[in-house]
Every structure is written in structure tokens, then in C-alpha cells.
Amino acid sequence: MDFTGVDSRYAPNREEARVSTQQLILSLVLATMVFSVALELRVEDFRRVAKMPRSVVCALIPQFLLLPVATWAATLALDLPANVEAAMMLVAACPGGSLSNFVTHYGRGNTALSVSVSAVASLMALVLTPFNFGWMMAANPATAAWLREIALNPNDIWISLALMLAIPMALGLSLSHHRPRLAERIRKPLGNFSLLALLAFIALGLVAQRHLLNAAILPMLAIVVLHNASGLLLGWLTSKAMGMSEPDKRAVMIEGGMQNSGLALGIIAVQFNADLGMVIIASLWGIWHIVSGMSLAIYWRKRDAGLAG
């Protein structure tokens, strides 16, 4: 596979120092994105967990344990550029957001389970996203060496991510609880603004490096497809092993295969200066997991219709 264009070892010279204003803006965009996610969370989402704890745990296992471990093992086995491996690890460390709720609902899975899992995962991600990303990067010789080359300390990344996620999440949860009407009114505009701002920044970076993209897109898409399929498979295997009902299996499978690529892109922009290889992996994930998730949902709906007929 040809990764020359996106391998950070062969990337054209870049400015060594980030522009502080740009970094501040990107940090604020990421914080706004996390804040808007927190505005969606409701107390009822967490109360439902007490009614189906086994199903919630079943859905969390592939997200926070199996997919990160499988991703780390895959990066050790594959000879990929360190920045590509780092992107795979980061995506695996970012649990899915509200999009998985829609796909689960459309596929006639257990929507209540999906919503509750997303709520719990959003809080767990405050600690486990930086933790999982940190240990995977440190336990892979190639990515650990790459971090040293670009002068990034894994502990600094952990602390920075925890703060960037925890503070806006706490503020969003507080506003959602104390001022629910205001939270509902500003949630969509803030979410749309932060996502569009992030995508605009990423798009400008991709356009500037478009001459490097052609050779790398297909092999990187293949990596994303296989990575996503692994998440879906791990979700299915976990739910089957724990004897879940069919609607629960669908919810767990979707939660296992849909990751928060938007959060991953935000972290890449802020922490890794929008590294091209990492951006491509996370961007392709953002597209492909919708394709695979909706394909499954459509298949399930058609199968249910056939059984009903």
C-alpha cells in the first residue's frame, strides 16, 4: 500500500510552531462541540440504565474494551505509518454519539438502550477516551516513537483531553439540568456551528494537500472499512455471547461499529495540527460508518417486513 503522501515521515516541511490564535479557535470549537453534546443528555437517560444494566454493560464492553484492544493488536500486526495507526487508535477511543441512536431506531433496534448507552458513554469518555488513546499509543513502539518525534508527551495529551472534554461536558450537563428550555433552544445551533467550523477547517487543509491524496485514499478506505467491520462484529459477538434479544443485539452492534469521528477530528485538529493521514482516516470513518450502519438498518427493516409478510 502506498502511504507516501500521508506518512508524516515523508510529509512536506510544515511550520514547527502552531499559530496560537488558530489553536485557541480550534480548542473553542471542540469545547463547543462537547458542550452541545452534553445539552442532549437528560436525567431520564441515566435512570433507564437501572432498568437494563446488563444490556448497557453489554453495549459498553465492545466500545471501551474490545475495539481498543483489537485496534491496538491490529496496529502491531500491520506495517502502517505511525500517524495512520494513531488515527485508528483515536477513532477506536471515541465512542459513538447520537447518530447511533437514529440508526438503531431506523433499524428497529432497542432505541431506549441506544440512547442510554450513548449518555453513559459520553460521561465515561471523559476518562476512558484519553486513557485508551494514551495506553494504545504508548504500548505501540511505532506510535510511541512518533510522539517523541513530534515532541508530544502522552501524559500531556491525557491531561489536555481530559480538561477539554470534562469542562464543557460539566457546563453542558449543568445547563441542561437547570435550564432545560434554554439548553434545548441552543443545542442545535451550537452543534451545527461547531461541526461546520471544524469541517471548514479540515476541508481547507485537505484542499491545500490535495496533490497528496489520490494515491492514499483507496488503501486508507480499505483500512476504515475493515476497522468498522471489526467494531460491528465485536458488538454482535458480545451481544450474542450475553444472550441479548434481537432488538438489543441490533443496538449493541450499532454502538460497537459507530464511533464519534467528529470528536476524533476535533482532537486531531487541536492536538496534532490536523495531521493529513489522521484527518483522512477520521474523515473516511465519518462517511463510512453512516453507510455501513444505514445499510444494516435497511437490511433489518426489509428482513422484518419479509418475516411479517
Where are these regions (language model features)?
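Alpha-helical transmembrane segments of multi-pass small-molecule/ion transporters
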Residues: 2-309
